[in-house]
Amino acid sequence: MKKARMTVDKDYKIAEIDKRIYGSFVEHLGRAVYDGLYQPGNSKSDEDGFRKDVIELVKELNVPIIRYPGGNFVSNYFWEDGVGPVEDRPRRLDLAWKSIEPNQVGINEFAKWCKKVNAEIMMAVNLGTRGISDACNLLEYCNHPGGSKYSDMRIKHGVKEPHNIKVWCLGNEMDGPWQVGHKTMDEYGRIAEETARAMKMIDPSIELVACGSSSKDMPTFPQWEATVLDYAYDYVDYISLHQYYGNKENDTADFLAKSDDLDDFIRSVIATCDYIKAKKRSKKDIYLSFDEWNVWYHSNNEDANIMQNEPWRIAPPLLEDIYTFEDALLVGLMLITLMKHADRIKIACLAQLINVIAPIVTERNGGAAWRQTIFYPFMHASKYGRGIVLQPVINSPLHDTSKHEDVTDIESVAIYNEEKEEVTIFAVNRNIHEDIVLVSDVRGMKDYRLLEHIVLEHQDLKIRNSVNGEEVYPKNSDKSSFDDGILTSMLRRASWNVIRIGK
């Protein structure tokens, strides 16, 4: 049997993980909000109309921050439509998803829901069809204590205390030709700079995210990032990254190698940020907000059909990917990659959270809620991936795929929780044919013992969970042993593993 070797030491530190790396995203899109988290009149809902079972599932994921309300949706969103008496709120055409937005949920309702799931809001402003003044008005409404037009409007709407939203996105995917109000890199750089400057006059404590490229495949990448930061470097704190992967070619081995592409993308953005830092002779670092990432491809044809042939509906079933086991493996691999860059990635948002390319699904028209395959790697990472990222030294067997060379069989990272005196090793065996023995030298962890080895595996890489039951769920494994500082773990072919040691 093949072997991989890894050395883990508490002195080999990358950075402490910012808990916001386990964030998510709720957009007014499809059934994410309506017929998702918000279903008034449903027996499963609370007095505010929010699904209690969905709230409990979100709590299982322990999501600390949620991006809202978009996404492409935000570029034609009028936030004023979603505040005040519900009966007075207008219905609007959502140009991004060819849907009807009823505005029954707005910033105040969403803030109330976020408190129920113990998350803070990451608010996006409309820089597509609107601009500086509207962004400032929204910030004033949300964060100013009172005594001004928009803060008093919030108080009149029954919300006395400000929401105190800390993180704000300056638009969404403004490099994309599909975006309402799409801009060139110079146009966006200027409006991002001026909007950021004005917003920080109102509330200097906020953190601002400038739009980076919609994916590494955009023709303007990475010149977009360089140009935008050339304008806005002094006023923003983060640059955003978005990336989705799919397996339309039905090539699993190559699909699982795409986390290597993710790593290249991240390194390129860091290099671009640091080039502008050097150019400006700045002492300030720009951090990364990877605020859209996931697997997304299953529903593409169905989505195109709905938007073309059945437009202008409330909560149409859009982007409802039902995930396979191999999708869960890539989500795990992407999480490992994000953790390895914890020194620069401070925020990340699994896109999305409920029904729309999501770990949580509610059946249509008020049916049961259930966990997708991708729920579990994210849950494990959010639960056990808190602490200091250690730099693992790995010697792994390699394989080639149709589009990638020298792909490591084993991808792994270790997290040291100093407070609990625990180390968690996350490892994916992305060899789809062979089991691999991972031998980890952890001799620096004196008096530690094996706590557990959790595994996510299935013989059928295309298997899915459903409302009728979970085919893919975590199990305890007896395939690890710990002796004299050497942790030996048998990693089944195509498996996600969480191996925990502690005192």
Swiss-Prot record:
Gene Ontology CC entries for this record: cytoplasm
Localization per record: Cytoplasm
Residue numbers marked as site, Important for substrate recognition: W296, Q352
Predominant place of localization: cytoplasm
pH dependence: Optimum pH is 6.0.
Reaction(s) this enzyme catalyzes, per UniProt: Hydrolysis of terminal non-reducing alpha-L-arabinofuranoside residues in alpha-L-arabinosides
Cytoplasm in keyword set: yes
Active-site residues, Swiss-Prot/TrEMBL: E173, E292
Transmembrane parts of this sequence: none
Lineage: Bacteria, Bacillati, Bacillota, Clostridia, Eubacteriales
Record-listed alpha-L-arabinofuranose binding positions: E27, N72, N172, Y244, E292, Q352
Signal peptide: none
Family: Belongs to the glycosyl hydrolase 51 family.
Example of a GO biological process term: L-arabinose metabolic process
One Pfam short name: Alpha-L-AF_C
Protein name (Swiss-Prot/TrEMBL): Intracellular exo-alpha-(1->5)-L-arabinofuranosidase
Record organism: Acetivibrio thermocellus (strain ATCC 27405 / DSM 1237 / JCM 9322 / NBRC 103400 / NCIMB 10682 / NRRL B-4536 / VPI 7372) (Clostridium thermocellum)
Subunit structure: Homohexamer; trimer of dimers.
Keywords: Carbohydrate metabolism, Cytoplasm, Glycosidase, Hydrolase
InterPro entries to which the protein is assigned, alphabetical: Alpha-L-AF_C, Glyco_hydro_b, Glycoside_hydrolase_SF
Thermal dependence, as annotated: Optimum temperature is 60 degrees Celsius.
Superkingdom of origin: Bacteria
Tagged with keyword Cell membrane: no
Gene Ontology molecular functions: alpha-L-arabinofuranosidase activity
Function of the molecule: Involved in the degradation of arabinan and is a key enzyme in the complete degradation of the plant cell wall. Catalyzes the cleavage of terminal alpha-(1->5)-arabinofuranosyl bonds in small oligosaccharides as alpha-(1->5)-linked arabinobiose/arabinotriose, but does not display significant activity against linear non-substituted arabinan. It is also highly efficient in the cleavage of alpha-(1->3)-linked arabinoside of xylobiose and of the alpha-(1->3)-linked arabinoside decorations of polymeric wheat arabinoxylan. It exhibits very low activity against sugar beet arabinan.
Pathway in which the depicted protein is active: Glycan metabolism; L-arabinan degradation
E.C. code: 3.2.1.55
